[in-house]
Structures are given as structure tokens and as C-alpha cells.
Amino acid sequence: MIELKEVVKEYRTKNKEVLAVDHVNLSIRAGSIYGVIGFSGAGKSTLIRMFNHLEAPTSGEVIIDGDHIGQLSKNGLRAKRQKVSMIFQHFNLLWSRTVLKNIMFPLEIAGVPRRRAKQKALELVELVGLKGREKAYPSELSGGQKQRVGIARALANDPTVLLCDEATSALDPQTTDEILDLLLKIREQQNLTIVLITHEMHVIRRICDEVAVMESGKVIEQGPVTQVFENPQHTVTKRFVKDDLNDDFETSLTELEPLEKDAYIVRLVFAGSTTTEPIVSSLSTAYDIKINILEANIKNTKNGTVGFLVLHIPYISSVDFGKFEKELIERQVKMEVLRHG
């Protein structure tokens, strides 16, 4: 269990004070994958560096497995950092060392005997899919392979928490998915708690159980990923979801001809089993209305499927529209009116 209570990080310069993290409260379940998403400058990198005290909070508490990180002695903090490991966007490998020796490095620092360290490193090489590349140097590896080395090195001391600081930002989409699949596998095998920060909603949707959205140092929205994805509340969250859907439809709306009287353009959001039910056709028949599908999309989250439909209803009375909306709610389908004639 990880808890952040009223965490603040303030930087003081000669001319001004910068509030990088502003009274953040988080509760992260042990064994879960928790994502923090935000645009550049949102404060997410500063936030994650306070989990292992690479940055000390100005105020507030960071508690991991019952330990108040800011209250640990130097030796206690050093021991805790072995259990709260981290991987980085640019890998941070030692270029003069082979794959195997990069993975052995934290074990050497921890004083593990060489034979045991080598055996552990070989096991990790296999776990991350690099068997046969033990003697390769970082310059001989692809970006995805370098990150696999970074992950193996981070696991060397059997951590309980893995922090991922934009770990896939430097990778192409296919390699990103491969690294995300590896993180899922490792979480399941080792019961890790994973906290990752990213600016990509795809990463959140693909592997996270819960998400916090940051802007200007504040957490502006948080909750289960499927819930946040299907029903975003804050403007920033809506933008992330829209970008993930590659949705330019609202821009196109401004170019459409004015709607006829009593016509509607609506967006429906389906989740779980409702994504495969013939709801639109049954409602079209029930209310004897024509429905044009202007746009359709479906996205998978770690815990379910979310579908999106944009519909044009050429004519429906306000009374029938109210019934139409009520029936959608009863079927657990969310509706947003985009335009009304």
C-alpha cells in the first residue's frame, strides 16, 4: 500500500517560488498498476521522484508499506530504495558494461556475492526476453532491448514497488506495447506494485488499474481507468481521451450545415457487455426513428471494452427524446448531446 498525504513540492529561486506539486493525495493498492498522466510541466516527474525520496517533499507524507519515507534514517532509506526501484525514459545504462554486468551492478552495490549475483542476473535476462544477448553492450541494442535491461536491473534486488518514469516515451508503438506486456507479466509473476507516469493515454488504457490526471501540480481527476475513460470530467482528461481516439469529429461539427428542427447529434459511450448489444437498432425500431451513424470507435482497457458512437437523429420529438435518453441510462449507456437543431 502506498499513500501520499497532502504532498507539496516547492522550488524557491531568487525571484519566485514554483509550486511543482500542490497538495496531492493518492492511495495505491498493493499489487496494482497505477498511472499518472499529464502534459509536460504538470508535475508528474517531480511527484514520482518523491516516492523513493530522490526529491524530498516540502511538506506532506509519503508512506510505503507502513514506512514514512521522510522519517527513515540514511541506512533505512538506502534499504527502502532497494525495494522501491525505478526505470527511466532514457534507460540510464552503463555503456562500458555488458547486458549481464549492467544487471549485476545493483547486486554488487548491495554486497551480494559474485556467484549469486551472476545467477540472479541470468535469471532476469531470461525473464525480460534477452537470453543470448548477455554479452552485448548497450550500443548494440535497440531501444526496446535497452529498456528490457533497465527493467531487469530494476528487479535485481526483488523490489515490491517499481516506478516507471516515462518508460515508453522513447519507443515506437509496437515496442511500447511489448514493454507494457512485459510489465504486466512481471506484475503478475512477482506481485509488484507498479506506478508509472506518462503523457500517453494509450499506456494508461493498456495496463493500468487506476489513473490520476495532473495539471499544474494538482491531481484534477482520478479513479478506475475504465470509469475515467468512458466518463471524463475535466477538460484535460477529455483532451487525453479525445487524442487517444484520434477524434477530430467535434472540429468537423463546425463545418456541418445547420441542423433541421428537432434533429440531434449525440455521442454514446458503451462499456462492458453493452458494447456488443444491438441497442441502437432496437431503439430505432421502438421509436420509429431513422438514425445515421456518423462515427464509431472501440477501445480496450485492461479491465474491459469501451465503445463510442456518434449518431445523427434527423427528427425526434422532445418527449420521445426524453424517453430515448432515459432508456439509454437504464441500459447503462451514457449520452452527450453535441448539437441540437
Swiss-Prot record:
Residues 2-241 form the ABC transporter domain. Its EC number is 7.4.2.11. It is an enzyme of class 7 (translocase). This is Methionine import ATP-binding protein MetN 2. The complex is composed of two ATP-binding proteins (MetN), two transmembrane proteins (MetI) and a solute-binding protein (MetQ). InterPro entries: AAA+_ATPase (IPR003593), ABC_transporter-like_ATP-bd (IPR003439), ABC_transporter-like_CS (IPR017871), ACT-like_dom_sf (IPR045865), MetN_ABC (IPR041701), MetN_ABC_transporter-like (IPR050086), NIL_domain (IPR018449), P-loop_NTPase (IPR027417). CDD domains: ABC_MetN_methionine_transporter.
